């Protein structure tokens, strides 16, 4: 939104989730608290995307091309693919993300445009 350059590392994959889905899950802890338990909360496994795909979705949502993007083969000292198992949160906290990355990115861009007037 601010026309600042950024770097995308090829081959890196992530699963993102929308804040509304995460907050709904965390709110369920109130009624389902189990002391000492740890939970992973993220989007659905089938939403895993290459970082470049997420970048392309964002660029599309803001109506920009990739001229400000530098593509690099690998980021040093990091895990290329970060897969998250949310099965325990699904079982204990009724975690059930509904907002796809495409919709979540669109909503986030709209929110940022409204709140930051960009």
Q: Model segments located where?
A:
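C-terminal substrate-binding subdomain of Rossmann-fold SDR/epimerase-dehydratase oxidoreductases
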Residues: 4-118
């Amino acid at each position: 939104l601010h026309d600042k350059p950024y770097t995308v590392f090829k081959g890196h994959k992530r699963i993102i989730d929308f804040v509304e889905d995460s907050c709904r899950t965390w709110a369920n802890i109130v009624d389902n608290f189990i002391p000492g338990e740890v939970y992973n909360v993220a989007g659905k496994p089938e939403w895993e995307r290459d970082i470049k795909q997420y970048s392309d979705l964002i660029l599309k949502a803001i109506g920009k091309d990739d001229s400000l993007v530098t593509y690099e083969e690998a980021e040093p000292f990091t895990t290329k693919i970060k897969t998250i198992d949310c099965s325990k949160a699904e079982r204990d906290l009724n975690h059930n993300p509904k907002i796809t990355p495409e919709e979540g990115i669109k909503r986030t861009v709209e929110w940022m445009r409204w709140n930051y007037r960009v």
